[in-house]
Swiss-Prot record:
GO cellular component: cytosol; small ribosomal subunit
Official protein name in the record: Small ribosomal subunit protein bS20
A GO molecular-function descriptor: small ribosomal subunit rRNA binding
Family: Belongs to the bacterial ribosomal protein bS20 family.
Pfam family, one: Ribosomal_S20p
Protein role: Binds directly to 16S ribosomal RNA.
Keywords attached to this entry: Ribonucleoprotein, Ribosomal protein, RNA-binding, rRNA-binding
Highest taxon of the lineage: Bacteria
SUPFAM superfamilies, A to Z: Ribosomal protein S20 (SSF46992)
Biological-process GO terms, alphabetical: translation
Length: 105
């Protein structure tokens, strides 16, 4: 932290601290790897949902039904990998199914 003379403004500098302890270094590396994996899984879920929504908005009910199953499968996989909480997954699946039912009815 740096305090400029004659002012009350503090400038905080962020410093990437690298741990010295071997186990802490390993935890940092594992966190980085898991973050990348979680991002990839979340991205696949979002992509599946977008495919479903675009198919439904184009009026292709058959393709939308196929994409709905794929989106639900991607959401369930994210739950088994520990990326999404089960309640979050249930909420997403429910909203997708309601949207499908409302649009195709």
């Amino acid at each position: 932290m740096l305090l400029l003379p004659g002012s009350h403004v503090k400038i905080v500098r962020e410093v990437n601290k690298v741990p010295n302890i071997k186990s802490a270094m390993k935890r940092v590396e594992l966190t980085r790897i898991r973050t990348l994996r979680n991002k990839a899984i979340k991205s696949s879920v979002k992509t599946a949902i977008k495919k479903f929504r675009t198919a439904l908005e184009q009026g292709d009910n058959h393709n939308a039904a196929v994409n709905l199953r794929q989106a639900i499968r991607a959401i369930d996989k994210a739950v088994t990998k520990g990326v999404l909480h089960p309640n979050t997954a249930a909420r997403k699946k429910s909203s997708l199914q309601r949207y499908f039912n409302k649009t195709t009815a």
